[in-house]
């Protein structure tokens, strides 16, 4: 295993070897922030014996996560589990696979991609006798995103006895949305908006679950922290 600080400058070494409290690294593009983050991960494992299963390392794309895993394994070896080096959506999926039964969903719930969302919307449009084209699909995805900025809808989906007929509106887009989430529940499907919302709702509703994950995660590191949303920040703060 290589010496973890050989390729680092003094500022990077300071960030890598700091182990207590909040650490904020401010630097421009291409200055080695990600290098410092991956080396800090390796430093915690090698020098302090922290298990990789106790370190959460968040990045924003699967490509970036895979690159970080590659760098970490180059320093530590292939045997180390880097499954907690992931996007926030992937991490939330991991949490929900363990905990979502509390919300009356099966652990093998479906993660809905754009194709799945379109199929569900096509079903809704057929039921309502509406023609769906590319423009209307994009519009409804934007409406779903807007609607799901509020987490209150999760309580409907988490209640197996919820009566969806109580959700009414004169706006066609609202009616489509209500039918969409009803079908989501029928298929036990969560879209990308739901993954974070369900995790926040779960942590808020079941303090013992939040405490479990807070205890498990000794260190949390976030790449490109300046790009996170307010909701993502709320989730990270809870942890």
Short names for language-model regions:
Residues 1-106, 111, 211:
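P-loop NTPase Walker
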Residues 6-17, 21-25, 56, 64, ...:
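Conserved helicase NTPase motor core
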Residues 18-19, 80-83, 101-193, 217:
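ATP-hydrolysis module of ASCE/P-loop NTPase motor domains
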Residues 43, 74, 123-127, 182, ...:
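A generic structural signal for well-ordered alpha-helical segments enriched in polar/charged residues
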Residues 53, 66, 70, 74, ...:
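Solvent-exposed alpha-helical segments within well-ordered globular domains of core cellular machineries
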């Amino acid at each position: 295993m290589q010496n973890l600080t050989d390729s680092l400058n003094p500022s990077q070494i300071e960030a890598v070897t700091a182990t207590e409290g909040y650490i904020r690294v401010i630097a421009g593009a291409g200055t080695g922030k990600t290098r410092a983050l991956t080396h800090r991960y390796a430093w915690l494992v090698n020098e302090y014996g922290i298990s990789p299963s106790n370190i959460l390392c968040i990045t924003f794309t699967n490509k970036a996560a895979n690159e970080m895993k590659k760098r970490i394994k180059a320093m530590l070896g292939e045997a180390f589990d880097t499954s907690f080096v992931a996007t926030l959506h992937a991490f939330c999926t991991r949490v929900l696979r363990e905990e979502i039964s509390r919300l009356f969903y099966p652990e093998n719930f479906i993660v809905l991609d754009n194709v799945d969302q379109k199929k569900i919307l096509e079903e809704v449009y057929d039921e309502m006798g509406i023609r769906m084209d590319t423009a209307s699909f994009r519009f409804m995805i934007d409406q779903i995103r807007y609607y799901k900025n509020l987490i209150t809808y999760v309580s409907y989906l988490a209640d197996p006895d919820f009566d969806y007929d109580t959700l009414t509106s004169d706006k066609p887009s609202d009616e489509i949305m209500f039918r969409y989430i009803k079908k989501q529940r029928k298929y036990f499907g969560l879209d990308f908006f739901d993954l974070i919302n369900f995790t926040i709702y779960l942590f808020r509703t079941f303090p013992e679950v939040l405490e479990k994950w807070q205890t498990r995660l000794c260190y949390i590191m976030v790449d490109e922290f300046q790009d996170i949303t307010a909701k993502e920040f709320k989730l990270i703060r809870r942890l």
